[in-house]
Amino acid sequence: GFNVDLNNQKVCDGMNIHAAGVEKTYLNYRFSQPYRVSTQHSERFIPDVNFPRQYSVRVNPFLKFPDGILKKPAFDPYIFHTDTSTQYWQSRASLVSSSEGGTMDFSESSRVRKFLISGAESYNRFNSLAHNGYGERQCFFPSNNLHIGALMRALFSNLEEWVADGELPLDSIYPKIYDETLVEASSMFLPSLIKENFRAALNGSGDMEFGSRVKFNRGVVDLLAPEVIANHKVLVPAVDQFGHDIAGMETHGMESDI
């Protein structure tokens, strides 16, 4: 089971799950490859976003059985789930907290806090330089070199106090459907500089049929080119007049005047 060792003891009291979005490790499958994640242009046919997608237990809307990531209260850790803007566009992070149809927010386990780090990539080295990709001609805009280390250090300290001392942590800070901070990409308000050259492409998602031996976590993939049986509506954070995600935590670099 998740977070249980061979002596039936809890392994981790707390975890910081970073830059995952809704994607899970491709593990506990025959011939699995734990380092694989699906992107817009590679690894399309792996079961990394199939149910469950939330920490709390809920009923699978397609197969009608309950499942969740945290389902063993005696062994469940405290979790800080941190995503950046990249995870909403690439790793379908909206599905961690909202329905597959993009119509409603889900409440979350009391053992979980979720945070969006606004305007950032997954991670960057301190003092890294922006670039336009390979040969400086791969990307229209320069890459994002925002460093999030200081903010992550503060969050990790808060998680440690929760685990070690029992002090209640920060409330979750992430975009939601109900307050219109989580929206469809096609309806975003964007600054004119970005809007003129932006194609609003994001990584799609859907429940896929890998064969009967994948259902109920049995772990054998029979259909190597699976059929999408139900598409998901992937949403993204609404942005302000500067193009920064509204409902997230801003680093000191974003808060400084230029």
Give the residues covered by each predicted segment.
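C-terminal His-loop and adjacent cap/lid subdomain of alpha/beta-hydrolase
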Residues: 1-258
